[in-house]
Amino acid sequence: MISDIRKDAEVRMEKCVEAFKTQISKVRTGRASPSLLDGIVVEYYGTLTPLRQLASVTVEDSRTLKINVFDRSMGPAVEKAIMASDLGLNPSSAGTDICVPLPPLTEERRKDLTKIVRGEAEQARVAVRNVRRDANDKVKALLKDKAISEDDDRRSQEEVQKMTDAAIKKVDAALADKEAELMQF
């Protein structure tokens, strides 16, 4: 019983960390990355479709993304979706492809992005702590039903706390890496 609760908590904490890493990978740094456009959806024959399903996104150079749209008639819609996103990008058609130059980040924008990333990190920490609370509540319920001893309860809480500390350490490490990446010129 307790081992199942611990395993469940560990899996959920790992999902929180991975979700955080995915979220911050979408934050624009000075370098071009195809994942930058992951959140963009394009209206394709009346339905909203992720850009990844309509085109291939490659890195042309450190400051330019190249989008090869599978259906040529969707080029203008893809450009419109990129401009409508809050990424501050200005795509341009280059023959059959769309080029998306990434303007250099200003110091002020870097600081804003750092604040955003810190906020995401705090949300991830809160999510990890919520998983810890849920696991501890389940163990307390077992203790209340006299299914486990107080020693098992204490031991389980200590192990869940160790898992929580490890997950938060991973979040902090990813945050430090992203902040360093954002502040590079």
Swiss-Prot record:
Biological process terms from the Gene Ontology for this record are: cytoplasmic translational termination
Report if keyword Cytoplasm is assigned: yes
- Which Pfam families does the record cross-reference, listed alphabetically? RRF
One GO MF term attached to the UniProt entry: ribosomal large subunit binding
Q: Which UniProt keywords apply?
A: Cytoplasm, Protein biosynthesis
The family classification in the record reads: Belongs to the RRF family.
Q: Which NCBIfam families match?
A: frr (TIGR00496)
PANTHER family in alphabetical order: MITOCHONDRIAL RIBOSOME RECYCLING FACTOR PSEUDO 1, RIBOSOME RECYCLING FACTOR
Could you identify this protein by its name? Ribosome-recycling factor
Provide the species name.
Answer: Salmonella paratyphi A (strain AKU_12601)
